[in-house]
Amino acid sequence: MPSNDYWQFPAIDPVLFHIWGPLDIRWYGLAYIAAFAFAYFWGMRQTKTDPNWSKEEFSDLMFWGFIGVILGGRIGYTLFYHFDYFIDNPLYLFYIHEGGMSFHGGLLGVIAAMYLYARKKQRSFLQVGDFVAPLVPMGLFFGRIGNFINGELWGRAAEVPWAMYFPSGGPVPRHPSQLYEALLEGLLLFAVILWFQRKPRGVGAVSGLFLLGYGVARFIVEFFREPDAHLGLLSLGMSMGQWLTLPMIILGIILMVRAKKQLPTG
């Protein structure tokens, strides 16, 4: 029987309201809407101070990014975390009603969309990345809040005062790792990027900071997050999430060093 010494997960219905038949509006779907709404708002705000971008160009980029994050997120979730399901039934890729999105897959989808956009508009890929990077962290914040409301992706067993019992997490208190991610990958990373942008930076610096910041935050939180049951811990005792973030950290450092060399010294 759960002890009263720890927090109980708030009884939040994942369904915000029912529309008709199988159609529901879920909190997680609302989180995606909030993420894209904030990205659109902040991107439009950036066009006012960045002479290299017009509102029309950004709106076009948002459309490409939306397609990229949805397709990439679902494909990545299927291939990275449920490849065995996909092999047994390739149609599992389209079981969107069952949920399941991967940030790393979504990131790859956005990168592909950015590449196609940059090529079409004859822009520097890294310049596009620098414009997009500040738009992402708050989307991560809303997404992780959605995970928390769904009572999914909870953390490892814990005895800290703020540990929590999750309905699907068994009889042990756990880290609310979704909230850790919302704070680190979302609010903190957004604040760091805004602070970093106050001074002129070389092309690719902001993109690099995002990759590095997200990678480090996710790598740390994975120590508190319960590994996927069907994967467990992989080589060197690291989770799939940690292995997927290592290339991001390395690439982020490379981009930041490269960008710094572009700036005049002294």
From Swiss-Prot:
Binding sites annotated in the UniProt record for a 1,2-diacyl-sn-glycero-3-phospho-(1'-sn-glycerol): R144
EC class of the enzyme, as a word: transferase
GO molecular function: phosphatidylglycerol-prolipoprotein diacylglyceryl transferase activity
Membrane topology recorded in Swiss-Prot or TrEMBL: Multi-pass membrane protein
GO cellular component: plasma membrane
InterPro entries linked: Lgt (IPR001640)
Keywords tagged on the record: Cell inner membrane, Cell membrane, Membrane, Transferase, Transmembrane, Transmembrane helix
Transmembrane intervals: 19-39, 61-81, 91-111, 125-145, 176-196, 204-224, 237-257
The keyword Amino-acid biosynthesis belongs to this UniProt entry's keyword annotation: no
Pathway the protein acts in: Protein modification; lipoprotein biosynthesis (diacylglyceryl transfer)
GO biological process: lipoprotein biosynthetic process
Subcellular location field: Cell inner membrane
Top-rank taxon: Bacteria
PANTHER family recorded: PHOSPHATIDYLGLYCEROL--PROLIPOPROTEIN DIACYLGLYCERYL TRANSFERASE, PROLIPOPROTEIN DIACYLGLYCERYL TRANSFERASE
Role played: Catalyzes the transfer of the diacylglyceryl group from phosphatidylglycerol to the sulfhydryl group of the N-terminal cysteine of a prolipoprotein, the first step in the formation of mature lipoproteins.
The protein's name in its UniProt record: Phosphatidylglycerol--prolipoprotein diacylglyceryl transferase
Organism: Idiomarina loihiensis (strain ATCC BAA-735 / DSM 15497 / L2-TR)
